[in-house]
Amino acid sequence: MELVFIRHGQSEWNAKNLFTGWRDVKLSEQGLAEAAAAGKKLKENGYEFDIAFTSVLTRAIKTCNIVLEESDQLFVPQIKTWRLNERHYGQLQGLDKKQTAEQYGDEQVRIWRRSYDTLPPLLDKDDEFSAHKDRRYAHLPADVVPDGENLKVTLERVLPFWEDQIAPAILSGKRVLVAAHGNSLRALAKHIEGISDKDIMGLEIPTGQPLVYKLDDNLKVLEKFYL
């Protein structure tokens, strides 16, 4: 069995080196090209999908659409879920990473970005960019909508969707594409690969590059590689 992850192509805020999180930004020109190249590469290597899962953020949805279009599979059903959203970066969202490091120190920013269990400063629920004010999340209980997350909380958010939707799809024989975000994919990778809390800090997933997992019947990883 195989599973393909793809992190969305470069976003406009990736290009500007800003913290993004749940803020909804578009793909950059480079990001659009990365997604198209990924779709073509998947087609060239014979990858076909029966279902695709993505987040409710534009950059991941757009990447999913482009990948499927470029691989002549735009007909493949897509399921969009908030559970595959990027990690919520709280008050850091929209800030310049370099300037934030100058203000708080490189080590503090590294911990905020890569630590498994350290939360960023939380965003106020009344902030104009709070997810509580976004109709994408209006159906969710207020205590479920995050104001800031670490990777541990992100995994706790993503894991129920893996167990309820993604894993059963793979086990039923479906060929699955997951188009999501750096940290939601890191969280899934941690679970699938059994990566330790310490080692997950060093895992980077590049934008726009298909990551293939070959899995056994228990969804244990047999092989992992980028196309």
Swiss-Prot record:
Q: Which EC numbers characterise this protein's activity in its record?
A: 5.4.2.11
One Pfam annotation reads: His_Phos_1
The catalytic site is made up of H8 (tele-phosphohistidine intermediate), E86 (proton donor/acceptor)
Q: Which CDD domains match?
A: HP_PGM_like
A biological-process GO annotation:
glycolytic process
Query: What pathway does the annotation place this protein in?
Result: Carbohydrate degradation; glycolysis; pyruvate from D-glyceraldehyde 3-phosphate: step 3/5
What SUPFAM superfamilies does the record point to? Phosphoglycerate mutase-like (SSF53254)
A Gene Ontology molecular function term of the record: phosphoglycerate mutase activity
What reaction does this catalyse? Answer: (2R)-2-phosphoglycerate = (2R)-3-phosphoglycerate
Residues annotated as binding substrate: 7-14, 20-21, 59, 86-89, 97, 113-114, 182-183
What disulfide bonds does the UniProt entry report for this chain? none
Marked site (Transition state stabilizer) residue numbers: H181
Q: Which UniProt keywords apply?
A: Gluconeogenesis, Glycolysis, Isomerase
What PANTHER family does UniProt report for this protein, alphabetically? PHOSPHOGLYCERATE MUTASE (PTHR11931)
Which proteins does it associate with, and in what oligomeric form? Homodimer.
Protein function: Catalyzes the interconversion of 2-phosphoglycerate and 3-phosphoglycerate.
Name the family.
Belongs to the phosphoglycerate mutase family. BPG-dependent PGAM subfamily.
What is the protein named?
Answer: 2,3-bisphosphoglycerate-dependent phosphoglycerate mutase
Its taxonomic placement starts with: Bacteria, Pseudomonadati, Pseudomonadota, Betaproteobacteria, Neisseriales
